[in-house]
């Protein structure tokens, strides 16, 4: 399930679409001047297109995870991308509980688990073994023999008697073979399992984990907030146009340019409503009950395999 965007409290970026991307727009800059916290998730919506978006930047949140473990570069990159993705997906559902991404691999990375609560507090860990080349692909990391398992779990904060967490299985391949990266995996899942056209851009390094999500709004034609009707073909054209703008994003740009500047460059001539950002944070409140629940979520087979692999 997805949630509607809250009432706008920010500024507007107005204009017409062109294929170029110049630097700044004063109205949006005025809104962001009050947003000094780096660890934030920003929601936005296009007035002239049936599209909503989110942009997340994890800095201190991400570094708090890295301070606790020394991961090889490919593991760090995948873990950071999973954290950014978990924040984006959590902000996109109406749910009081935790969204958990669980990746159990058959390669050098045996397990990655990321948990994001409804208030965007997060924690994450990974288990790996052996030497891992810096250029290792997703398949080489977790799906060498095609036996990897990836799941999205929604674990309610308050459970009714007998209620079990919802879990969706996420394929790592499509009809053409293994999917190349985490963004492609989640896009494929959202399209085929949730029937939602979704695009994701993810990146991480030693200091930042960032991501952007664009999602086509369900329903028939109509300009957001105006009641004006459009043909489905117009909606599809607008969706494709916004995605083309997103495709101009480069990994280095996502990791080096602040959220304000990046959104201005991408959508400088679109009419975009910007909403009050939400703050992310690292939080690990381990307790006997929480550890027990985590082990139950992993399943007996996975827990026993960890013991079997101990020297």
Name each region found by the language model.
Residues 1-34:
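N-terminal mitochondrial targeting presequence
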């Amino acid at each position: 399930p997805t949630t509607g965007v809250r009432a706008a409290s920010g500024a507007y970026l107005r204009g017409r679409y062109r294929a170029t991307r110049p630097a700044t727009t004063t109205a949006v800059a005025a809104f962001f001047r009050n947003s000094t916290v780096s660890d934030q998730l920003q929601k936005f919506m296009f007035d002239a297109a049936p599209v909503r978006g989110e942009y997340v930047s994890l800095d201190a949140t991400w570094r708090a995870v890295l301070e606790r473990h020394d991961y090889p570069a490919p593991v760090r990159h995948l873990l950071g991308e999973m954290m950014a993705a978990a924040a984006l997906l959590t902000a996109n559902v109406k749910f009081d509980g935790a969204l958990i991404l669980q990746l159990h691999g058959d390669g050098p990375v045996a397990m990655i688990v990321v948990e994001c609560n409804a208030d965007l507090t997060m924690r994450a860990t990974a288990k790996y073994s052996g030497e891992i080349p810096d250029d290792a692909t997703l398949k080489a990391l977790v799906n060498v023999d095609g036996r990897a398992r990836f799941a999205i779990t929604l674990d309610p904060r308050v459970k009714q008697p007998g209620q079990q967490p919802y879990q969706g299985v996420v394929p790592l391949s499509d009809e053409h073979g293994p999917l190349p990266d985490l963004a492609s995996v989640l896009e494929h899942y959202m399209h085929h399992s949730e029937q939602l056209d979704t695009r994701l851009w993810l990146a991480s390094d030693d200091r930042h984990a960032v991501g952007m999500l664009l999602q086509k709004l369900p329903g028939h034609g109509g300009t957001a907030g105006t009641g004006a009707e459009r043909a489905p073909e117009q909606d599809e054209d607008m969706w494709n146009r916004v995605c083309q703008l997103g495709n101009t994003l480069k990994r280095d740009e996502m990791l080096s340019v602040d959220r304000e500047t990046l959104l201005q460059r991408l959508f400088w001539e679109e009419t975009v409503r910007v909403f009050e950002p939400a703050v992310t944070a690292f939080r690990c409140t381990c307790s006997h009950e929480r550890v027990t629940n985590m082990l139950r979520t992993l399943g007996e087979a996975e827990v026993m395999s960890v013991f079997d692999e101990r020297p």
